[in-house]
Amino acid sequence: MAQAEIETLRAQAAAGEIVLAYVDEAGFSQVHPNRSAWTPTGERHLIEAKRGKRLNVLAAMISNGELFSANFWETTTAAAFSGFLSLLQEHVAGPITVILDNASIHKAKAEREFIEYLKKQGVTLYFLPPYSPELNRIERLWHKMKHTWMAPKCRDAKVLEIDIGEILSNFGSKYTFSF
């Protein structure tokens, strides 16, 4: 049912009736995640986990092909998310439907009043069914960034910011994918 509703929203966006945005947040660690390892038979498998600082990105993949994003080193909070929605609404200047998951920061009680205000400004939130990341197209961006476009290496904070910025600012030209 959600897939059919999203197809209807996509048709409305294609007709220029609404702006559609797939919104999500992702965190990027200074140390690339270790996805596999080899351990001899009979030995205990141990890998020391190092993370370093984490750069968080809130982003919207907009139906016009644009990527709108904000990066920050702090924890992603409900207030940060509400602020991002406000900036997104100002950026698109028109009715916008936001497709997003059910993360607690998206539904925080402390931000309900502000979310109601945004609704009056033309922002509609469309919450996906639980456990259906395949319906949020921006999830594909995070996967590509983490596992294809970013080389598996350790980075200091500045290099991590530069690498993330390079991808986000060149999305749609140098960095692309199709559905």
Predicted segments — roles?
Residues 1-179:
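Short functional hotspots at interaction and active-site rims
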